[in-house]
């Protein structure tokens, strides 16, 4: 089998997997992660991103459920200005 040349991508995807056996002294170096490892990593990252999105939307929802006075004032002014721009044509 022909060996691939190292490119910046393959160099960056190389990793070291340390497995402790018996005396805990053996280390095994793996070349590139296999597709299962890449998929696990991808799913882990995406679930972290999803958790962040949920947290942000939850905070926004909470601010709507229990808004501060400043937030209400700003929101009311924005609505009033947009209403005045439309005029009484509606």
From Swiss-Prot:
> What quaternary arrangement does the UniProt entry report?
Oligomer. Interacts with human SLC25A6/ANT3 and VDAC1. Interacts with host MAVS.
Subcellular location field: Host mitochondrion inner membrane; Host nucleus; Host cytoplasm, Host cytosol
Q: In which family does this protein belong, per the annotation?
A: Belongs to the influenza viruses PB1-F2 family.
Q: Which residues are listed under the site Low pathogenicity? A: 66
A GO cellular component annotated for this chain's UniProt record is: host cell nucleus
Pfam family membership, one: PB1-F2
- Which species is listed as the source? Influenza A virus (strain A/Swine/Colorado/1/1977 H3N2)
Q: What does this protein do?
A: Plays an important role in promoting lung pathology in both primary viral infection and secondary bacterial infection. Promotes alteration of mitochondrial morphology, dissipation of mitochondrial membrane potential, and cell death. Alternatively, inhibits the production of interferon in the infected cell at the level of host mitochondrial antiviral signaling MAVS. Its level of expression differs greatly depending on which cell type is infected, in a manner that is independent of the levels of expression of other viral proteins. Monocytic cells are more affected than epithelial cells.
| UniProt KW keywords | Apoptosis, Host cytoplasm, Host membrane, Host mitochondrion, Host mitochondrion inner membrane, Host nucleus, Host-virus interaction, Inhibition of host innate immune response by virus, Inhibition of host MAVS by virus, Inhibition of host RLR pathway by virus, Membrane, Modulation of host cell apoptosis by virus, Viral immunoevasion
Q: Which InterPro entries match?
A: Flu_proapoptotic_PB1-F2
> Its principal location?
host cell
The entry's protein name is Protein PB1-F2
Q: What else is known?
A: Is not encoded in all strains, and seems to be dispensable for replication.
Location of region: Disordered: 1-34
Which GO BP terms apply? symbiont-mediated perturbation of host apoptosis; symbiont-mediated suppression of host cytoplasmic pattern recognition receptor signaling pathway via inhibition of MAVS activity
Q: Where is this region: Mitochondrial targeting sequence?
A: 65-87
């Amino acid at each position: 089998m022909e060996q691939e040349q190292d490119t910046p991508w393959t160099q960056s995807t190389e990793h070291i997997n340390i497995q402790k056996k018996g005396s805990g002294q053996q280390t095994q170096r793996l070349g590139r992660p296999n597709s299962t490892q890449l998929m696990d990593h991808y799913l882990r990252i995406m679930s972290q991103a999803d958790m962040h999105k949920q947290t942000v939307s939850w905070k926004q929802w909470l601010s709507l459920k229990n808004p501060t006075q400043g937030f209400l004032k700003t929101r009311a002014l924005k609505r009033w200005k947009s209403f005045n721009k439309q005029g009484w044509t509606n």
